[in-house]
């Protein structure tokens, strides 16, 4: 990615969106400028780095301070128009020179600690991912030369509070944020980074020994599992709209059972073979309901009423009034059939189950008895 392509906006739904840079780039720049300030013994207010994607960033330095053989500097995180929990916070680096010839990297205040296997970092280490570790160490080595050593501490005073708005605790990263970024650049509306964060949670679950997973669209699904199924939510992973991707990731990781749990408004799309459930990709909820109601012998009057509905909830009221609630078991079986069709070339496909529930947390339907599914999940 050239500097020109970094400055060029990302167009999304007709809007020009600005790119940003990662916490990894912030930490790298802060460490580099702190090392330079120790060597030169004067404050520096701007620093440039080359990101892993080849982009040169020129960043403003905040809170520079020198005290003997130690310096501190901060870079303010700018996610561009892809605002996340870390946007606008300061990422600090403290660099202390020594004669060891080695560079040691640690995480201080506000940087999370790894407490579970599965994310590629040792247990008990700071949540500074591999690529940022490499770029930080390389930038400091470039600044101090081959003979000197340095202790580098990355810290973020707001980190612990900001981390509460992230997935970190679910990934076993406690006490702060993660220093992340494989390219160093934040691309607005990047589905790939979002999908990767969801997949990472699957990897954590598998590394902990789980072989069965419950995929839900969001928090409502997790609450249903806890309150109505009596199953430990440790097995629950959010799939958002990325149904097909998360199923494929679960297969890749070797899960033997996948249970899809959600409201018909989301899961009904899978019955039509739609594995990305965001409305900008496809809708077809009413069409799917009408088709399957017709297969079950529903009268034309009901089909017309459902076809004219704007929401699944409205359609469900008509379905209940006409006594066709058994469609939800039918749809759950159809969902499982569609999943197995998607996985037809998989050598050892997992068991697939589907459970549909209402907004008031009542079971609407499933491909087989929910008690049976719950019992297997508790094994």
Curated annotation (Swiss-Prot):
Substrates-to-products reaction catalysed: Co-precorrin-5B + S-adenosyl-L-methionine = Co-precorrin-6A + S-adenosyl-L-homocysteine
One Pfam family from the record: CbiD
Keyword hit for Transferase: yes
EC number: 2.1.1.195
Methyltransferase in keyword set: yes
Disulfide cross-links: none
One BP annotation, GO: methylation
Family: Belongs to the CbiD family.
Protein name: Cobalt-precorrin-5B C(1)-methyltransferase
Source organism (scientific name): Salmonella typhimurium (strain LT2 / SGSC1412 / ATCC 700720)
């Amino acid at each position: 990615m050239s500097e020109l392509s970094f400055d060029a906006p990302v167009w999304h739904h007709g809007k020009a969106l600005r790119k940003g840079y990662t916490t990894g780039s912030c930490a790298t720049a802060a460490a580099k400028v702190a090392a330079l300030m120790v060597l030169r013994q004067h404050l520096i207010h701007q620093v440039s780095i080359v990101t892993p994607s080849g982009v040169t960033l020129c960043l403003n330095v905040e809170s520079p301070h020198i005290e003997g053989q130690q310096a501190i500097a901060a870079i303010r995180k700018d996610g561009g128009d892809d605002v996340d929990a870390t946007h606008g916070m300061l990422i600090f680096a403290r660099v202390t020179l020594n004669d060891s010839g080695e560079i040691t990297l640690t995480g201080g205040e506000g940087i999370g600690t790894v407490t579970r296997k599965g994310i590629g970092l040792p247990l008990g280490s700071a949540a500074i991912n591999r690529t940022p570790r490499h770029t930080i160490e390389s930038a400091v080595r470039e600044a101090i030369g081959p003979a000197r050593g340095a202790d580098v501490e990355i810290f973020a005073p707001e980190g612990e509070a900001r981390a509460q708005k992230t997935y970190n605790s679910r990934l076993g990263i406690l006490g702060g944020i993660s220093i992340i970024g494989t390219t160093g650049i934040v691309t607005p509306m990047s589905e790939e980074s979002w999908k990767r964060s969801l997949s990472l949670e699957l990897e954590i679950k598998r590394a902990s020994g789980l072989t069965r997973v419950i995929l839900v669209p969001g928090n409502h699904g997790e609450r249903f599992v806890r309150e109505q199924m009596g199953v430990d939510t440790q097995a629950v992973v959010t799939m958002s709209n990325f149904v097909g991707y998360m199923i494929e990731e679960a297969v890749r990781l070797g899960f033997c059972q996948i249970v899809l749990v959600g409201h018909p408004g989301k899961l009904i799309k899978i019955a039509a073979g739609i594995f990305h459930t965001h409305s900008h990709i496809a809708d077809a909820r009413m069409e799917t309901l009408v088709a399957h109601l017709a297969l079950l012998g529903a009268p034309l009057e009901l089909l017309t009423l459902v076809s004219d509905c704007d929401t699944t909830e409205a359609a469900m009221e008509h379905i209940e009034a006409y006594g066709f609630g058994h469609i939800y078991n039918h749809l759950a079986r159809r969902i499982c059939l569609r999943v197995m069709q998607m996985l037809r070339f998989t050598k050892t496909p997992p068991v697939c189950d589907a459970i549909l529930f209402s907004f008031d947390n009542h079971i609407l339907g499933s491909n087989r008895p929910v008690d049976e599914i719950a019992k297997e999940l508790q094994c």
